[in-house]
Design a protein with these regions (language model features):
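Extracytoplasmic small-molecule ligand-binding "clamshell" domains
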Residues: 39, 46-130
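Ligand-binding clefts/hinges and TM-proximal coupling segments of bilobed small-molecule sensing domains
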Residues: 36, 46-51, 183-197, 234-238, ...
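Periplasmic-binding protein-like
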Residues: 148-156, 223-264, 284-301
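A ligand-binding cleft/hinge motif common to bilobed small-molecule-binding domains
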Residues: 117, 131-139, 208-209, 213-242
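Short helix-initiation/N-cap motifs at beta->coil->alpha
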Residues: 106-117, 160, 177, 195-205, ...
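Extended ligand-binding regions for polar small-molecule ligands
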Residues: 30, 45-47, 91-100, 179, ...
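Acidic, polar ligand-binding/catalytic clefts
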Residues: 95, 104-167
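Bacterial lipoprotein signal-peptidase II cleavage site
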Residues: 26-47
């Protein structure tokens, strides 16, 4: 190859490269190009799409529907009754909230671990699923004033009754994922083997089938379950700190949060939650439980 041919080839390559660079520069300046701020947002983990925001009170009223996340397998708090309808302590509360807003209620059934996600993804307006207030959850959602108080309990077969946590060492404890029982035992009782289930129904079936030595969740729940399942007993009725249960909304949704808080105060003046207890919980607990050990009126402990 002669020198003149080589020189022509090099010039052609340089010219082509320059053309490509110029074309890329023009494209970068076009309407689809990311601005420096957008690039910074992306590199810092920020979303370039708009945030999914919660519905305002006006939007809820105009839609005619209040969207509420509830349990469908946790009697007597949230479950499906024999007629296929949502029922329970939380459901009575949800129906009253919707009534006072002048709308109907639309229920979304959730597993314990999904109670935060349905709010952050804006699938519901309120989570009202026996939701215990914790510092970790407060970082992700906003809690209203409480309407119940609760601790953990442990239920087991009465012929092998667990009456002290020390008896669980080396044994299998059934829990539901995403619950305070899960976090409590992982943090405080590492020698207890945890068998986890997504749904309460599956967890209780595991206990009934003998796949674990005991089951732990809210004491209000295990006390109710043991009353309707012969051969089981709540040997530990109060474990860990006494916590509260409250409605939750999407983080930053102050308008709906303030409305719920005002509603809880108003309902307290008519003793609403004690009436709810009489209707939904007393038929299960009977005289074994003092309603004042569970019920919180007006958000005041």
């Amino acid at each position: 190859m002669t020198a003149s041919i080589i020189n022509k080839t090099i010039k052609s390559i340089v010219a082509a490269s320059a053309a490509l660079i110029m074309a890329a520069s023009v494209a970068a300046c076009g309407p689809n190009a990311a601005t420096p701020s957008e690039e910074n947002n992306a590199s810092n983990g920020g979303a370039t799409t708009s945030k999914v925001t919660a519905r305002s009170l006006d939007e809820i009223k105009k839609s005619g529907v209040l969207k509420v996340a509830v349990f469908s397998d946790k009697a007597p708090f949230g479950y499906i009754d024999k007629d296929g309808k949502n029922a329970g302590y939380d459901i009575v509360f949800a129906e009253r909230l919707a009534k006072d807003l002048g709308v109907k209620v639309k229920y979304t059934s959730v597993d314990p671990a999904a109670r935060v996600d349905v709010l952050t993804s804006n699938k519901v307006d309120i989570t009202l699923a026996n939701f215990t207030v914790t510092d970790e959850r407060k970082e992700k959602v906003d809690f209203a004033q409480p309407y119940m108080k609760v601790a953990l309990g442990v239920v087991s077969p009465e012929n092998t009754e667990i009456t002290d946590v020390s008896q669980l060492k080396g044994k299998t404890l059934i829990i539901a994922k995403g619950t305070t029982a899960e976090s409590y035992f992982e943090k405080n009782e590492p020698d207890v083997k945890l068998q986890k289930y997504d749904q309460y129904a599956d967890a209780y079936n595991a206990l009934l089938d003998g796949r674990g030595d005991a089951f732990s969740t809210d004491n209000t729940e295990v006390l109710a379950w043991a009353k309707t399942n012969k051969g089981f007993k709540v040997g530990i009725t109060k474990l860990g700190d006494e916590d509260t249960i409250a409605p939750a909304v999407q983080k930053g949704n102050k308008e709906l949060l303030n409305w719920i808080n005002d509603e809880i105060v108003k309902l307290g003046k008519e003793n609403f939650f004690h009436k709810d207890y009489e209707q939904t919980l007393k038929p299960v607990y009977g005289s074994d439980v003092d309603p004042d050990d569970i019920v919180v009126e007006g958000g005041q402990l």
